[in-house]
C-alpha cells in the first residue's frame, strides 16, 4: 500500500506534477543559494557562448532535482534528453544516447548512482573530452574507435551521492545538495499550485498542509490534491483550515507529517531502551526493505532530530521520547 507521505513518485503523478511544475526562476520557490549560483553560472556561459559545466544534484527525493534541470535547459535555451540509470543497461544504450545529442544539449540522468562500472567507464571520456571510445573485438585483436561528440552538459541526480564513484563524481564541475524546504516555502508552493488548479485556499490551510509535508514539495502537492478532493466533495469554493485538518486526519497524517510507519519506527527505537538497532533489524521489524528505510524514511527524521544514526546503529533521541510521551532510558548515552 502506498503511503500518502511517500517521497517517491506515484505512477499516476507525472501529469499532475507536470501541470504544476514551475517553468522559470521566478516561479521556483526555495533552494535560494542554488538558484542564485546557477543564475550566475548560466549567465556567464551564455555570455561566453559556452556550454554549462556538468551538474550534480543530490539530496532526498522529491525536492526538485528534475525541475531544476528543466529550468536550466530553458534558461540555456537547450534541448534536454531525460533518462534514468536503470534504463542504461548496456554500453550500446549509452552510446545511442550520446551519439544522438546535438551541440549544447543537456542530458539528464536520474538515479545516476545506479550506473554500472562498465557504463561509467564509457561516460568518463564523454564528460571530459566529449569523446566516445568504442571497443571492437576482444583480446589482442581488440580495437578502439574514437568518435567525437558535440559539447553537451550532463546533469546527474541522485539520492545517494556516497554511492557515486570518485572518478565520476570528480567529473561534475558543479555539485549542489538540495535541502528540505521550510513550511513557509511549502505554503507558497501550495498556494501557487492551488491557483493553477483554479482553487482558492486560505493562508492558514496552506501552512497547515506545509507543516505536514516533511519539507518536501512532492508530498505537499500530493496532500493538496487529496485535500482538494475533500473540499470539492463538500462543494466548497475555498479550501479552509477546518476542512484541511479534517482531511489530513482522515488521511492519517499527523501535525508533524508522520504516518503510522514513522511512528512504528520511532516506537521501535524507543523500546530498545538506549540500545542501537541495526538497519537490517529495523527493516525486518517493519517489513520494509533497507533501501526504503535509509533513503526514504530516515532523511526527514534525521534532519529534524527524531533519530540518531551512529556507527553502531539507530537510536532514539530525546525528541522521540517526548512525542511518544515516554521516559527516556537513563543509560542512553544521548542523554
From Swiss-Prot:
Ranges where the record places region Head domain (RuvB-H): 255-335
HAMAP family in the cross-refs: DNA_HJ_migration_RuvB
GO CC annotation terms, alphabetical: cytoplasm; Holliday junction resolvase complex
Lineage of origin: Bacteria, Pseudomonadati, Campylobacterota, Epsilonproteobacteria, Nautiliales
Reactions the enzyme catalyzes: ATP + H2O = ADP + phosphate + H(+)
Record remark on domains: Has 3 domains, the large (RuvB-L) and small ATPase (RuvB-S) domains and the C-terminal head (RuvB-H) domain. The head domain binds DNA, while the ATPase domains jointly bind ATP, ADP or are empty depending on the state of the subunit in the translocation cycle. During a single DNA translocation step the structure of each domain remains the same, but their relative positions change.
Name under which the protein is recorded: Holliday junction branch migration complex subunit RuvB
Compartments in which it is found: Cytoplasm
Its EC number(s): 3.6.4.-
InterPro entries named in the record: AAA+_ATPase (IPR003593), AAA_lid_4 (IPR041445), DNA_helicase_Holl-junc_RuvB (IPR004605), P-loop_NTPase (IPR027417), RuvB-like_N (IPR008824), RuvB_C (IPR008823), WH-like_DNA-bd_sf (IPR036388), WH_DNA-bd_sf (IPR036390)
Region (Large ATPase domain (RuvB-L)): 1-181
GO MF, one example: ATP binding
Any one GO biological process: DNA repair
Subunit structure and binding partners: Homohexamer. Forms an RuvA(8)-RuvB(12)-Holliday junction (HJ) complex. HJ DNA is sandwiched between 2 RuvA tetramers; dsDNA enters through RuvA and exits via RuvB. An RuvB hexamer assembles on each DNA strand where it exits the tetramer. Each RuvB hexamer is contacted by two RuvA subunits (via domain III) on 2 adjacent RuvB subunits; this complex drives branch migration. In the full resolvosome a probable DNA-RuvA(4)-RuvB(12)-RuvC(2) complex forms which resolves the HJ.
Enzyme kind, highest EC tier: hydrolase
Binding site for ATP: 20-21, 62, 65-67, 128-130, 171, 181, 218
Residues that bind DNA: 309, 314
A Pfam family annotated for this UniProt entry: AAA_lid_4
Annotated segments matching region Small ATPAse domain (RuvB-S): 182-252
Record family assignment: Belongs to the RuvB family.
Protein encoded by which gene: ruvB
Native source species: Nitratiruptor sp. (strain SB155-2)
Amino acid at each position: 500500500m502506498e503511503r500518502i507521505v511517500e517521497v517517491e513518485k506515484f505512477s499516476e503523478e507525472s501529469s499532475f506534477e507536470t501541470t504544476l511544475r514551475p517553468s522559470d526562476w521566478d516561479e521556483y520557490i526555495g533552494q535560494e543559494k542554488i538558484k542564485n549560483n546557477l543564475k550566475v553560472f548560466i549567465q556567464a556561459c551564455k555570455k561566453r557562448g559556452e556550454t554549462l559545466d556538468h551538474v550534480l544534484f543530490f539530496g532526498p527525493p522529491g525536492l526538485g532535482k528534475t525541475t531544476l534541470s528543466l529550468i536550466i535547459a530553458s534558461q540555456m535555451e537547450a534541448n534536454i534528453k531525460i533518462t534514468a540509470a536503470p534504463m542504461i543497461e548496456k554500453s550500446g544504450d549509452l552510446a545511442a544516447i550520446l551519439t544522438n545529442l546535438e551541440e549544447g544539449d543537456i542530458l539528464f540522468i536520474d538515479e545516476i548512482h545506479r550506473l554500472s562500472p562498465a557504463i561509467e567507464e564509457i561516460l568518463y571520456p564523454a564528460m571530459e573530452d566529449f569523446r566516445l571510445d568504442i571497443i571492437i573485438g576482444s583480446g589482442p585483436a581488440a580495437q578502439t574507435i574514437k568518435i567525437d561528440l558535440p559539447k553537451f552538459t550532463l546533469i546527474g541526480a541522485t539520492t545517494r551521492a556516497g554511492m557515486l564513484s570518485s572518478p565520476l563524481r570528480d567529473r561534475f564541475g558543479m555539485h549542489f545538495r538540495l535541502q528540505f524546504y521550510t513550511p513557509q516555502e511549502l505554503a507558497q508552493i501550495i498556494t501557487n499550485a492551488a491557483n493553477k488548479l483554479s482553487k482558492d485556499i486560505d493562508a492558514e490551510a496552506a501552512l497547515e498542509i506545509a507543516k505536514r509535508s516533511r519539507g518536501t514539495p512532492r508530498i505537499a502537492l500530493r496532500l493538496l490534491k487529496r485535500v482538494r478532493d475533500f473540499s470539492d466533495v463538500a462543494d466548497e469554493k475555498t479550501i479552509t483550515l477546518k476542512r484541511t485538518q479534517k482531511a489530513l486526519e482522515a488521511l492519517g497524517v499527523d501535525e508533524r507529517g508522520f504516518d503510522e510507519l514513522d511512528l512504528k519506527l520511532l516506537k521501535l527505537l524507543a523500546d530498545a531502551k538506549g540500545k542501537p538497532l541495526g538497519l537490517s533489524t529495523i527493516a525486518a521489524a517493519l517489513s520494509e526493505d533497507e533501501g526504503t528505510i535509509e533513503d526514504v524514511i530516515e532523511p526527514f527524521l534525521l534532519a529534524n532530530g527524531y533519530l540518531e544514526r551512529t556507527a553502531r546503529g539507530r537510536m532514539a533521541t530525546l525528541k522521540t521520547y517526548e512525542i511518544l510521551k515516554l521516559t527516556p532510558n537513563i543509560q542512553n548515552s544521548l542523554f
